[in-house]
Design a protein with these regions (language model features):
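Short solvent-exposed coil/turn linkers within tandem alpha-helical repeat scaffolds
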Residues: 16-22, 53-61, 152-162
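A cross-kingdom marker for long, charged
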Residues: 127, 149-183
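Alpha-helical scaffold segments of alpha-solenoid architecture
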Residues: 59-116
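Alpha-helical repeat scaffolds
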Residues: 3-15, 41-53, 78-92, 110-120, ...
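Residues that mark the junctions of alpha-helical repeat units in TPR/alpha-solenoid scaffolds
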Residues: 24, 61-63, 118, 125, ...
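"A position-specific structural signal for the A-helix of alpha-solenoid helical repeats
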Residues: 23, 30, 66-69, 127-131, ...
Length: 183
């Protein structure tokens, strides 16, 4: 039921955004980042398809596609039958932009070291570290959790990747009933 509620909420947000590609891009970013945290590939795919329908900017589309791909890898989900991730990545204009480098990295055209060396500033360097760690985590390597925790505590706190790293490394608290009856 929660999954269906999340999908309905995303659909409503996209309906409210209409054809405004900037607003739809923001909705897609939020939905795809939530999908990664919830390990829900279908939620991410829904966000990606809508972002593509409104022709979201490359800077939004690349992140949504990356997060959907990582979600698929983390859950061992097969790519969608329409291969939306590949279509989105191939639609990104190639050149020297950071979005282009991220798309190339996701397609395997750049390795982690090449992505890191192409990062020009603190946000890009943080993102390069995040994606290298996430690729390992998606493959089952939990030894990268300290690296993600470092990213979460780093100086690029405004990045969605920093928030994702924080959420992924936060201790999980099990809440239960109190040991004795409450008054």
């Amino acid at each position: 039921a929660d999954r269906q509620a999340a999908l309905r909420a995303v659909q409503r947000a996209f309906e409210a955004a209409g054809s405004d590609k900037d607003t739809a891009g923001i909705v897609a970013i939020e939905a795809a980042s939530d999908a990664l945290l919830l390990k829900d590939p279908e939620l991410g795919r829904t966000a990606l398809r809508r972002a593509m329908e409104v022709d979201a900017d490359d800077e939004d589309l690349v992140y949504v596609a990356l997060w959907v791909r990582l979600t698929e890898q983390m859950t061992a989900a097969k790519p969608a039958h329409d291969d939306a991730v590949e279509k989105a990545l191939k639609s990104i204009e190639r050149g020297t932009s950071w979005a282009s480098k991220l798309a190339d990295w996701s397609e395997g055209k750049l390795d982690d070291a090449a992505l890191a060396s192409g990062a020009r500033d603190l946000p890009q360097k943080t993102e390069a570290s995040f994606y290298a760690a996430m690729r390992k985590l998606a493959a089952g390597d939990r030894a990268v959790l300290p690296e993600l925790a470092r990213i979460a505590r780093g100086n690029a706190l405004q990045l969605v990747e920093s928030r994702l790293a924080e959420e992924l490394t936060a201790p999980r608290v099990q809440l239960g009933s109190p040991g004795k009856p409450l008054p």
